[in-house]
Amino acid sequence: MQVGRYEILEIIGTGAHGRVARSHDPLIGRLVAIKLFPKELASGAARQRFLQEARVVGQLSHPSIITLHDMGIDEATQTPYLVMEFLEGQPLDRILEKGSIPFSRASAWAAELASALGVAHRKGVIHGDVKPANVLITDDGRVKLMDFGMARLASRDSAATPLVGTPAYWCPEQIMGKPQDARSDLFSLGVVLHEMVTGQRPFDADSLQGICGRVLSSTPLPPSHANPSLPTGFDEVVSRCLAKDPSARYATAEALAQDLYPLARRKVIPQAPPQTNGNGLRDRAARLLRSA
């Protein structure tokens, strides 16, 4: 199968917004990843909107943003596509299936993601779907944010669509159908950060209605409740990201990154398990006497 000049080698992922294929660029002789979108995006006003927004996304340059190489609409099949750098790695959601992530690594990744979002926001690009499935961790430990603007690109309606993405990472204004801005992405990143260090989503529930209700009205337990070894100040960072009122969140992604980078470099000292009686102290004293 061929799309444009690119040879499709295999489909490596399928999601709500399309399919991703490992592909070969014969002109340059390199592997690339191609995202294939529904054909509906190639007709009418949707076609022009797809091309315009893809051009904006293609201007984003940051070490933690997947690089967009090319875009087009295949003449033979009328399939819209984006051509991106191909990287070996795993999506963050698959890594989180194994449990929480060490704090220093999680906070460093989150700081890089915040820095990447800052670059996009300055260009007027809102991600709109920040979640672990859209974060790639490469085999050499780098973090890459994927699918910038893809939630809007994949919408068949030219108007803003309030409910796209994954409910557990929606912000309150998204649920209420209000306008979203850069601070909406920071709410979603706060959910991801909470999940990375605790292994738990802060607004999880058994139903869509339950999740939305929690996002709108509940205050989650601080991350330190599940992970007491977290450094002082981290709970406040997450709490600020998850504020219901956007004006109470970080004003910019750069401000969030500036708070996260120092925390990522801070050593985490695991707390000793609490002693329920005096036996632990007596046992330690006995060992010291025996070794004397």
Feature names for model-found ranges:
Residues L117, T166-A272:
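C-terminal lobe helix-coil module of Hanks-type protein kinase domains
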Residues R19:
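Conserved N-lobe ATP-binding subsite of Hanks-type protein kinase domains
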Residues T77-P91:
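Conserved short submotifs of the Hanks-type protein kinase catalytic core
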Residues M71:
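Activation-segment/catalytic-loop signature of the eukaryotic protein kinase fold
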Residues W109-A110:
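Activation segment signature within eukaryotic-like protein kinase domains
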Residues S115-V125:
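Protein kinase catalytic-loop region centered on the HRD/HxD motif
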Residues P38-Q59:
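AlphaC helix of the eukaryotic protein kinase fold
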